[in-house]
Amino acid sequence: MKTLFKKIATSAVAASFAVTAFATGPVAADQLTDRVAAGETIRIGFSNEPPWAYPGENGEPLGFVHVIVLGALEKMGITEVEPVVTDWGGLIPGLKADRYDIITGGMYILGSRCENVNFSDPFGVFADVFVVKKGNPKNIHTYQDIKNTGSVLVTGAGYNIVEFARNEGVPSDKVMEVPGPTEMLAAFMAGRADAIGSNFFAASLLVEKSNGAAELSDPSKLPDWALNWGGIGFRKADTDFLAAFNEAMGEYMGSDDMMAKVAEYGYTSDTLPGDGQTAYACANR
């Protein structure tokens, strides 16, 4: 692949995961390309969202999204990054405030988000699902079920679930927003919520942690519009870097190396996104 970057030096300071690189192509035209050309660290922003993206014991970026992102960056000659962990609801504001350079948290590509950031080509296609009480006594499978039973839905602040529930007419006082998965499960287990709204991967982990008190709803009963593509978020101005990243990710996506590394997180060939869905998702999600 003809890349924009060629790595020539790497910092030995493990805590910063710093990278030193220079551009081999034309003079940089955007902030992130300039940053790499100047030998500065690329900062990746994410929250604690296993198995998508989360920090390890030493702050290192783990999860299947980071396998894909780091694999693509490596093809661009960038092998180390600086992780920045924040709450999910602060990811887009943090990118716009220049606290990091890329959002690697595993965001769905939604029209409301596309107004604020540019997304990469998709790294996967995903279904949402509800975590419900064992036996699903309220028969909750859709947003309409939440609405019609007067159930309380808990989800993360800034999650797509909030927007989808609102669009489906679930009253705002029946949607509880909390910082993340730990708080979502706590509210559910304490009886403050009847269902948890999340993506299939994260919801499956919450069921495992419920000690047999929960199960998953049937995701096939949700409408087609609830199917979503995940993307990596970039500043609007960083178009040159995004183009190079998309090229590199396209080469890495679905490779034997990638599929071997993401398997431990539950990502399979069924999750692969297909081609060219970013514009469609921005317009239709």
Predicted regions and their residues:
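A ligand-binding cleft/hinge motif common to bilobed small-molecule-binding domains
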Residues: 90, 106-115, 164-167, 194-226
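Ligand-binding clefts/hinges and TM-proximal coupling segments of bilobed small-molecule sensing domains
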Residues: 160-173, 215-216, 248-285
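Flexible hinge/capping segments at coil-to-helix
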Residues: 134-151
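Periplasmic-binding protein-like
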Residues: 125-131, 208-246, 268-285
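Ligand-binding cleft/hinge of the Venus flytrap
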Residues: 55-57, 69-79, 159-179, 207-212, ...
